[in-house]
UniProtKB/Swiss-Prot annotation:
GO biological process: defense response to fungus; defense response to Gram-negative bacterium; defense response to Gram-positive bacterium; killing of cells of another organism
Keyword set includes Lipoprotein: no
PTM comment: Contains a choline moiety at the N-terminus and a tenuazonic acid moiety at the C-terminus.
Source organism, top-level taxon: Bacteria
The protein's name in its UniProt record: Antimicrobial protein BL-A60
pH dependence, record text: Active between pH 3 and 11.
Temperature dependence: Retains >80% activity after 15 minutes at 100 degrees Celsius.
The organism of origin for this protein: Brevibacillus laterosporus
Keyword Cytoplasm part of the UniProt annotation: no
Keywords: Antibiotic, Antimicrobial, Fungicide
Origin organism lineage: Bacteria, Bacillati, Bacillota, Bacilli, Bacillales
Function statement: Has antibacterial activity against P.solanaceum (MIC=10 uM), X.vesicolor (MIC=100 uM) and B.subtilis (MIC=5 uM). Has antifungal activity against P.capsici (MIC=15 uM), B.cinerea (MIC=25 uM), V.dahliae (MIC=200 uM) and F.omysporum (MIC=50 uM). In P.capsici, inhibits mycelial growth (EC(50)=7.89 ug/ml), formation of sporangia (EC(50)=0.6 ug/ml) and cytospore germination (EC(50)=21.96 ug/ml).
C-alpha cells in the first residue's frame, strides 16, 4: 500500500 500512495501523490 506504499506504491499506491506514491501514485496518488504523484497525481
Amino acid at each position: 500500500l506504499y506504491k499506491l500512495v506514491k501514485v496518488v501523490l504523484n497525481m
